[in-house]
Regions:
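Hydrophobic pocket/interface hotspot
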Residues: 17
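Acetyl-CoA-dependent GNAT
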Residues: 8-11, 22-97, 106-108, 112, ...
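Conserved active-site alpha-helix within GNAT-family acetyltransferase domains
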Residues: 103-104, 127-145
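Conserved catalytic-core motifs of GNAT/GCN5-like acyltransferases
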Residues: 122-126, 142-158
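Terminal substrate-recognition subdomain of acyl/acetyltransferases
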Residues: 2, 155-167
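Structural motif
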Residues: 20, 116, 138-139
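Glycine-rich phosphate-binding loop
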Residues: 100
Length: 167
């Protein structure tokens, strides 16, 4: 059986996380965003964002490795608009990551948000992406009724906020 290791990300992990993110975005948003825009999802583009998040100190990044190979990661921290609530900024996984492994990483993220003193964790999900909505609903997240239209990748997308009660 494969060995799963969950640990905080370091600067040495940025290249691998950026490569995974580039592949993930192209897969996740296929059918929602034009291919021309998706081809701009490059590792260099994502590395800059990941580096800024890691260096800011405002965000935490946990990653999971399966037998030493990066399989998924999650970015989270304090919600700047609601400091008593945590916010999961993104979760990225490879195509071979099991639902159980995703659950273990999300559980660790939620535990750290609890330890930070948060009472609720929020997560924004593309409304048309039923696969991701189904995953997080199975992990205990529920839509809280908040919805927004956000310009992402040069295109307006409809997103819904999900919440998880930490206490």
């Amino acid at each position: 059986m494969a060995k799963l290791t969950i640990r905080p990300a370091t600067a040495d992990d940025i290249a691998a996380m950026a490569e995974l993110k580039s592949t993930y975005v192209r897969s996740l948003y296929r059918g929602f965003i034009s291919q021309d825009i998706l081809h701009r999802s490059t590792p260099d583009f994502h590395a800059a964002t990941l580096r800024a998040w890691l260096e800011s100190g405002m965000y935490r990044i946990l990653l999971a490795e399966c037998d030493g190979v990066l399989s998924h990661y999650i970015v989270f921290g304090t919600n700047p608009e609601e400091p008593h609530n945590g916010l999961i900024y993104e979760g990225v996984s490879s195509s071979f990551t099991s639902t159980e492994d995703k659950r273990l990483l999300v559980d660790r993220c939620l535990q750290e948000l609890r330890e930070m003193g948060h009472t609720i964790a929020h997560l924004w999900i593309l409304m048309d992406n039923f696969r991701v909505r189904f995953l997080f609903e199975n992990l205990g997240f529920r839509p809280d009724g908040a919805r927004e239209n956000r310009n992402m990748f040069g295109q307006e997308l409809h997103i819904a906020r999900y919440q998880y009660k930490l206490k």
